[in-house]
């Protein structure tokens, strides 16, 4: 799938604009602070109903405006189109509409418009807390395994019940045992989906990484959140007293992690910033391949400041891999001359100059 049309109103410093992007490569260039990243933020808002720059949405709404709105016309892989719209009012009301109907949740947006973000904060995937890697993992599982979301919702409900009981002791023994059973059943299902996903992801990631950079010995492994040699029911029973003292459940899928190691060390501790960026890109591109295989569709990639941290050789390699995905890509940079070479002649490339919030489409640099 791809975005055929994007309409943006009152998002940060952007002037109201309607964009007709290329179904493949789109390059947004201009000076720092011109609004390039805000375009990516608008697309992200359309696909996930949240910003990647702020946990609060009020800063996204343009000064002295009551609301921001993003509308998108999506070209579906199987043919036809779907119309998506999100609107956020300054008072807090959030509206999501799909083909003229109010959506039940942001998950419906995510399913229709699978987005991959690569930006300066992407290093957190390697350096940050396990929660960030779980989000990466679960994004991938969500898009290839339709049974994942109901199982994840069951897990969250069981965890809330158990944690409430641990803090307040409000459940009788029979109810406590019932919720523990539900927690274990949902956990086993989640663990199975995650393990299957990592099994499929690893060879694609390794192949993709090898085309970007030589990092012999880099390993990707999955920790499920409790001892691999013990049943979760046994672990919960043995840690009950400590769980009560802590007020939450310490073992289970909510503690899962992905581990990237090189020469026995955490990869983030020994890789350069450029190498870390390439590892993250390889992970994101590998996910895109799996989405294509499972859904017969494509992710949309948002790549903020692609040239940073990379020399010419690695920039070209990354662009080639993004091009080979045959998906829609939005790339920001200060100087588009850094990205002018390397695209195949038949690949449609659109250029957009961004200056003080105004966006102007310019000629394909190959013409």
Curated annotation (Swiss-Prot):
Its main location: cytoplasm. ATP binds at residues 30-37. PROSITE patterns: RECF_1 (PS00617), RECF_2 (PS00618). It is found in: Cytoplasm. Keywords: ATP-binding, Cytoplasm, DNA damage, DNA repair, DNA replication, DNA-binding, Nucleotide-binding, SOS response. Signal peptide: none annotated. InterPro entries: DNA-binding_RecF, DNA-binding_RecF_CS, P-loop_NTPase, RecF/RecN/SMC_N, RecF_2. One of its GO terms (cellular component) is cytoplasm. One of its GO terms (biological process) is SOS response. Pfam families: SMC_N. SUPFAM superfamilies: P-loop containing nucleoside triphosphate hydrolases. GO terms for molecular function: ATP binding; single-stranded DNA binding. HAMAP family: RecF (MF_00365). Belongs to the RecF family. The RecF protein is involved in DNA metabolism; it is required for DNA replication and normal SOS inducibility. RecF binds preferentially to single-stranded, linear DNA. It also seems to bind ATP. PANTHER family: DNA REPLICATION AND REPAIR PROTEIN RECF (PTHR32182:SF0). NCBIfam families: recf (TIGR00611). This is DNA replication and repair protein RecF. It comes from Pseudomonas putida (strain ATCC 47054 / DSM 6125 / CFBP 8728 / NCIMB 11950 / KT2440). The lineage of its organism: Bacteria, Pseudomonadati, Pseudomonadota, Gammaproteobacteria, Pseudomonadales.
